[in-house]
């Protein structure tokens, strides 16, 4: 790695291998990544492309470094597609949103007043510590078709405070026209969960993804939404988006549903839960978030509401009648509606969504048989069974 740059990205030391670049291209790489430079041996390496324009080189390098760092930390950190801004005492606010939501613009404006953590990814470990990624920002410049990659210091963005950074706020960006100033509102976790999942990298590799998210959300006092038109309006409200003393995240234990025997008449169909990677109970009102992973390792979060949570919890090889009883026991009779019709409709939706599976009831087991093992000598004329 002699003569190449080592940078800090999401808690990983990434070596930028620039051996094939000319002097101008190498200087451009050094200048773009100067604020992320660190010491020590690289954990992983990314080889800079040769050929093409310097702007194309820097853009490609930024994307590849990001992907390599995220890949290196998969399953270890909660990595949010978010901008990160640090207050002087090290508390960090994560501004969450997809591409085009305004994260880079918000980073530039807020970074002039506070510390720039990242405009791309906020990586948080199990203790709530944030690992910075002071990558160059992609900037549109007049008369240029390709975006420029400018270092935070060149753009006048703030340095990070000494010491460790700690997650203190999770904020969903809501940039839209016609908003005067910045309007801050609380967001229920159940309502924010789908977006937080969508903006998380390699969530399926975390052992308890939903409960991990919930633990971090609880440690910062909940999720907030900030609606605004001009990013300048965010400067004055940023401190109130950070909790004063974030607590250490505590991941809750998994819910144990146990088993239930099938009693009463033998049903034509029985229903069972499709096992999720993780589940998260949500209160007020009673809801249940489920995170399923398909054969392609893609994750899907679903928040069950209404009578669906009770149906899912009760679906342990039982028939429709037992599910009706479970719904009535949990939420009461539905008044003038037919409980069986309502439950059957809800169950059909859960089956269609691959949350429940349906099968025929198990048949009585065949009479027990004995068999002589294949490696035992057998001299009789009858079969081994």
Set out the residue ranges of the language-model regions:
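Conserved lysine of the Walker
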Residues: 103
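Active-site beta-strand termini and strand-to-loop segments that position acidic
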Residues: 7-9, 87-88, 292-295
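Long, charge-rich, low-complexity alpha-helical segments
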Residues: 300-385
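Extreme N-terminal, non-catalytic leader segments
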Residues: 2, 15, 28-89
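Short alpha-helical segments that sit at the start of domains
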Residues: 276-313
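Glycine-rich, often acidic-flanked micro-motifs
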Residues: 10-27, 42, 71, 81-83, ...
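Actinobacteria-biased recognition of intrinsically disordered, low-complexity terminal regions
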Residues: 1-5, 249-270, 357-385
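Post-Walker A alpha-helix
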Residues: 106-107
